[in-house]
Amino acid sequence: MLSRRRGVNTTMTTINHTSAGEQRGKKRLIHRFSWVSLLVCWLIWVLNAYDREMILRLGPVISKEFSLSPEQWGNIVALIMVALAVLDIPGSIWSDRYGSGWKRARFQVPLVLGYTALSFISGIKAISHGLTAFVLLRVGVNLGAGWGEPVGVSNTAEWWPKEKRGFALGVHHTGYPIGALLSGVVASLVLATFGEGSWRYCFLLALLVAIPLMIFWAKYSTADRINTLYQHIDSQGLTRPATQESSHVAKGEGMKTFLRTLRNRNISLTAGNTLLTQIVYMGINVVLPPYLYHVSGLSLAASAGLSIIFTLTGTLGQIIWPWLSYSFGRKRTLIVCGLWMSIGIALFYFATNMPRLIAIQLFFGLVANAVWPIYYAMASDSAEERATSTANGIITTAMFIGGGISPLLMGWLIQFGGGWENPAGYIYAFFTMAGCALLGMLLQLMTTDKTPRKAH
């Protein structure tokens, strides 16, 4: 114990030798441990997004192989996506009880390896050749992936000073549009190279990346590193995240903490907005690939590749909007993004040719992914220190419930409009999504902004 403490003090020597006057005059720095943890959590999030979004890119080819109607496909996607919501709140409570910082990082390792291994198995045709077996495996994948999301968000926040939390979560969540983009690129390449019968190959990649990444993360996440990091944060005049002791949720307190967090008006209203926004985000992912294939007449490979154009600006939006949220305020930022999203999704009505489709996707993409880190930051700002992961779990559950509702609704609307080949159903879907974004914005109007004062 003494030698470990000496190791921490030795590491901190170069930091603490700076005089108080010099510290006040110099720019506040972020420790390399924060950057490394952000990179690892970002890569985990890329894998999560890639695997989760892949089934949406493959919608037309899967529907074709199993002869599924729009409503049947919507029901299947809803079942798979709602599985994301099942374990994230109990898993978040368990994660809070296990501990924060380096302990939560260790908690991630078997979780990520578990759901990526199931995904790998779903890519083996000998095992997943039947629709039932494939769907059950994908449900298993999403049970783990949904559990892992709030854990990953909380872990990102716990390696960064509170004043920089919005930035860190914004960068972290750029992993989602990158993962979604990769899902379209890989799906297009696999279908074009190996043929439509080989679509399962797309699910083999995530585990191959996860194994070395999780081995590194298990070795890197230590008590010494987190203690060194927190001392550095103190020395920079910034606010450390909740300490391991204060953030620890005692056994038997989990449900009380959850109910108390759920009664928080800011968190519950933001969760409502999250649910409605996810109907929009999941909806465009469900609707766009079949629209491009059945209505626009593109190939299966092209429809998979061109349905992710909005992720190009989505990455940019996830950096800009969370950064602006510190000076503009979380509440105002979410209201502006909600209005932008409503307009952007309604504009798909005018996407009658390829240049318009690309331009509208790029406009919509500027806010499509931007809101998620701000939702999490809003919940983290409003939650008790020891309930950060629980608050994030509530946001995530609302998101996943919206993700389960959306495919049901979109499949029904496409079927109601005349089926896969009729553009009317897609138009109904676009305007329904625009209404959901507008309603979510109205819910956010009733919240109170608790954005921490920006550090100078």
Residue ranges of model-derived segments:
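C-terminal ends and interior cores of transmembrane alpha-helices
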Residues: 113-128, 339-352
